[in-house]
């Protein structure tokens, strides 16, 4: 008898363990957002602690966090450092796993005060949730008194969301009873993607070295070297190296302070730096900076201010560490026409990062790069540096093309991949054509090989423009499925009614969904998938803005996150067992379509 009971128990365990083997492909194995990112908060007078318990295999994006108070004044919340995550479409972004705690200091709050918090996350398996917003009630507190003690308007115990959070059923996420849930603001690329510039702090070092060889900077180094040495030509090598290094550190101090100020200001505007109109504005600024590097106009400090700074620097005594350091610090404030545009571009990069360490470190490396040739000249003389000539103007123009790449990077987020490719093509053709024409004056034999390479690169870069002007090959013309967009429950019902007699596939898409981009690029472009979908009505919902209408549609369809693809039969009824959640490659999706149509 005991043997039979043990056997029965083992059979039951094995049944539950292997049940997943027979699940329909594409069925959701993802939990609701409230379970993936369990949110909690506690308030003790002026201190509010926001915490997220993040399920294994899921993560939150740092750049998607926003905080706003109504009826209260708060300090800017300080998010901890996360880990770096990279994907094909949106590059590097900072994410949080496991557990996240964010302290918020409430300076003062009214009785009806609230704190609105927005976040967004994804699963490693290729599934992204819409932005979540919680409105938290705050206990009323007055501003701290002169003796530093907080004063509560009402003697209230700590506020916590713990009693309100019961795990929702796996069918649909439900908000906590005590918390009001509102739709999140629009997000232009996902948090992994707030339009992060393709730049790192180490690039600043290389840019600084390059700027040193422009016509506004390199000819000044012999004069600066003499001033640093105090007119003394017979200093020991160690003494000359020390003075040059101190001068560069003084210059670096000014730039580092500027980086810290801009990064601190950037913390207040990170959310704004994700909106399309801001990206367009930044692109226009970068284009103007690039044009200044091409010599169309000059960007620099007013001449009167430059004169005052120069006179102040000249009053400092060269040859002494203190005087040399002060001269370097003042020199950092004098922006020449060649340094203004690259410096402005770096400052915009720092502002959109909002990271103090990154801001200070980036401009320190930039100043160090500019100072390295000065150190070499001060210690070894002119023999290690190239002679001045027309080539310095070419270096300046080349930096103009580098800066011009930044608006292309930003605008392709708004215009889409196709226009982005065309813009990169235009930039490539312009750069390689300029480099080819510039090299024609060279007389050295090996430059002929360089000219051939530049000409070939220009022709290759022009390919997307040729396809645009003369038409892409047939294979590329049928690369994308033609979806009909619907934006509400009523429009969806109407489209299903009009499609009576035909099967329907509904794709839910958003710009912040990386796996949606993968579906578009790798799956929907497959000839096998396109062939299998012939005779199927293709509908698509874009929920990028996460508007109330989008939220209502997702709730109506019981969709947890994206990508999600729904299938309807000829009678307009959803076949829920065929629903796809998460990314599927072309082969798996083709097989899924065949099973659906069988």
Swiss-Prot record:
| Gene designation | dsbD
What is the membrane topology here? Multi-pass membrane protein
Q: Which domain of life is it from?
A: Bacteria
Q: Which InterPro entries match?
A: Cyt_c_assmbl_TM_dom, DsbD_gamma, DsbDN, DsbDN_sf, Thiol_diS_interchange_DbsD, Thioredoxin-like_sf, Thioredoxin_CS, Thioredoxin_domain
GO MF terms listed in the record are: electron transfer activity; protein-disulfide reductase [NAD(P)H] activity
Chain intervals for the UniProt region annotation (Disordered): 147-187
Ranges of Pro residues composition bias in the record:
165-176
Keyword tags: Cell inner membrane, Cell membrane, Cytochrome c-type biogenesis, Disulfide bond, Electron transport, Membrane, NAD, Oxidoreductase, Redox-active center, Signal, Transmembrane, Transmembrane helix, Transport
Signal peptide residues on this chain, from the entry's feature table: 1-19
Note whether Glycosyltransferase occurs among the keywords: no
Organism equals: Klebsiella pneumoniae subsp. pneumoniae (strain ATCC 700721 / MGH 78578)
Thioredoxin domain: which residues? 459-598
GO CC, sorted alphabetically, is:
plasma membrane
Q: Which cysteines are joined by disulfide bonds?
A: 122-128, 216-338, 513-516
Q: What class of enzyme is it?
A: oxidoreductase
What is the recorded name of this protein?
A: Thiol:disulfide interchange protein DsbD
Record family assignment: Belongs to the thioredoxin family. DsbD subfamily.
| Function of the molecule | Required to facilitate the formation of correct disulfide bonds in some periplasmic proteins and for the assembly of the periplasmic c-type cytochromes. Acts by transferring electrons from cytoplasmic thioredoxin to the periplasm. This transfer involves a cascade of disulfide bond formation and reduction steps.
Reaction catalysed?
Answer: [protein]-dithiol + NAD(+) = [protein]-disulfide + NADH + H(+); [protein]-dithiol + NADP(+) = [protein]-disulfide + NADPH + H(+)
Q: Where are the transmembrane segments?
A: 197-217, 242-262, 277-297, 330-350, 356-376, 391-411, 423-443
E.C. number(s) listed in UniProt:
1.8.1.8
Q: Which SUPFAM superfamilies match?
A: Thiol:disulfide interchange protein DsbD, N-terminal domain (DsbD-alpha), Thioredoxin-like
Major location category of this protein: membrane
